[in-house]
């Protein structure tokens, strides 16, 4: 499941492997878990794991604010691949 893979990835990359308190609704920017530079790591992870094309127009903090918002982005892009743009 993408949600658990994302949580594990975020914990490994940004929290020294610590998942306590990290769930699908944790506000990643508000808690300084990720910053704007980390979005590109997350984009790469989502592209590899989900095989979706994420265009530049989709790369903004609202789509990466929580694990839940990233999963929703992937689901939307899978349902409407024309919205993704170039990979």
Swiss-Prot record:
All copies of domain Carrier, residue ranges:
1-78
The region annotated as signal peptide is: none
Q: Name one GO biological process term.
A: antibiotic biosynthetic process
The phenotype of cells or organisms lacking this gene is: Cells lacking this gene show a white phenotype and produce 2-methyl-3-n-amyl-pyrrole (MAP).
Q: Any keyword Phosphoprotein?
A: yes
Q: Which InterPro entries match?
A: ACP-like_sf, PP-bd_ACP
Positions carrying O-(pantetheine 4'-phosphoryl)serine are 36
Keyword Cell wall biogenesis/degradation in record: no
Q: Cite the entry's keywords alphabetically.
A: Phosphopantetheine, Phosphoprotein
Please name the pathway: Antibiotic biosynthesis; prodigiosin biosynthesis
Source domain of life: Bacteria
Q: What functional role does this protein have?
A: Involved in the biosynthesis of 4-methoxy-2,2'-bipyrrole-5-carbaldehyde (MBC), one of the terminal products involved in the biosynthesis of the red antibiotic prodigiosin (Pig). Carrier of the L-prolyl group transferred from L-prolyl-AMP by PigI.
State the protein's name. Probable acyl carrier protein PigG
